[in-house]
Amino acid sequence: MRIEKDKELMNILKIMAPGTPLREGLENILRAKTGGLLILGDSDQILKLVDGGFKINSEYSPSYVYELAKMDGSIVLSSDLKKILCANAQLIPDSSIPTFETGTRHRTADRVAKQTGAIVIAISQRRNIITVYKGGIKYVLRDSSIILARANQALQTLEKYVAVLDRVVNNLNILEFKDIATLFDVLTAIQRSEMVMRIVSEIERYICELGNEGRLIDMQLSELIKSVEEDGILLIRDYCRSNMEYEDIYKQIQGLSSEELLNLDGLSKIIGYTGVPLVDTLISPRGYRMINKIPRIPSNVIENLVANFNQLKCVMEASYEQLDNVEGIGEARAKAIKNGLRRLREQIMLDKV
């Protein structure tokens, strides 16, 4: 449910991640210091900009691309990256398209990308860097060792943030079972959950850019976060005003800047509490998050429970007969819910000690 802000960039990075045939060809050109200009796409709009060159129309191969890059012109690849269409071609984009690039190769790449929306790759001969353009996007591909170092640093930061989130959530769990949770406790948990998810998004981009070299980072990330996002969403469902859509609230929180996220009063307004003291306002959870922790309770049953009892404390105080009357809950499931909540409470109180 995260907003996919960099979806297009992530798709580009997947195509040219280390281990892919395209990246291998680009690395070969980079090592040879010949420079190069490649355009990915075979639409009529792209082919109209191609002037001269040789029609190749052969299977794509990293070694072929490397050899063809020794010539001055650009290389045109099919959009599925399976064929090399032509080489040593000149690209003639609209010269009125604004560009802030310097150097003929990069100016051409930027203009072609803006005009056609295709992926254009410029490899600098002197600076020895690979720059990718698509529409208004410009991205410089970095060496895997640099990305790996940054990913490891981000993982270390994530570990610390997850540890803080765990402490905040464990404290909230205790307060929820005692029914003395304050708005401050709830907002702190929501805030910390979003902070963790922002670091996760950054690491996911590194993993995408690392390709097959990012497997270990991916495994470590999966181990660290587990159900952080799901719990964060359930927190919002537990405490937002009943007339508000939790999905819209979650999107709003994702759209906050780092400074805005630190402002708990601003977060309070987003979940529907305006002008109330955060520390003194007691609020009760609906129970989505806690009941979700009980094994083998379907989501539709949780919805029915919350609709019937409105608050977690009412679910806990309900008799077996009252639970049995809820649609989707029989005698066995009523016992499972009562026993599950009791065990959860005992476990949380033990963890406190």
Swiss-Prot record:
An example GO biological process term is: DNA repair
What GO molecular function annotations does the UniProt record carry, in alphabetical order? adenylate cyclase activity; ATP binding; diadenylate cyclase activity; DNA binding
Q: What is its EC number?
A: 2.7.7.85
Q: Which InterPro entries match?
A: DisA, DisA_sf, DNA_integrity_DisA_N_sf, DNA_integrity_scan_DisA_link, DNA_integrity_scan_DisA_N, DNA_integrity_scanning_protein, RuvA_2-like
User: Which key words are in the record?
Assistant: ATP-binding, DNA damage, DNA repair, DNA-binding, Magnesium, Nucleotide-binding, Nucleotidyltransferase, Transferase
Kindly state which reaction or reactions the protein catalyses: 2 ATP = 3',3'-c-di-AMP + 2 diphosphate
Pfam families from the entry?
A: DAC (PF02457), DisA-linker (PF10635)
- Domain DAC stretches: 6-144
Question: Which cofactor is essential here?
Answer: Mg(2+)
Binding-site residues, ATP: G73, L91, T104, R105, H106, R107, T108
Q: What's this protein's family per the entry? A: Belongs to the DisA family.
The record's annotation in HAMAP family points to:
DisA
Subunit notes for this chain? Homooctamer.
Summarizing the function annotation, the protein's role is: Participates in a DNA-damage check-point that is active prior to asymmetric division when DNA is damaged. DisA forms globular foci that rapidly scan along the chromosomes during sporulation, searching for lesions. When a lesion is present, DisA pauses at the lesion site. This triggers a cellular response that culminates in a temporary block in sporulation initiation. Also has diadenylate cyclase activity, catalyzing the condensation of 2 ATP molecules into cyclic di-AMP (c-di-AMP). c-di-AMP acts as a signaling molecule that couples DNA integrity with progression of sporulation. The rise in c-di-AMP level generated by DisA while scanning the chromosome, operates as a positive signal that advances sporulation; upon encountering a lesion, the DisA focus arrests at the damaged site and halts c-di-AMP synthesis.
> What name appears for this protein in its UniProt entry?
DNA integrity scanning protein DisA
Q: Which gene encodes it?
A: disA
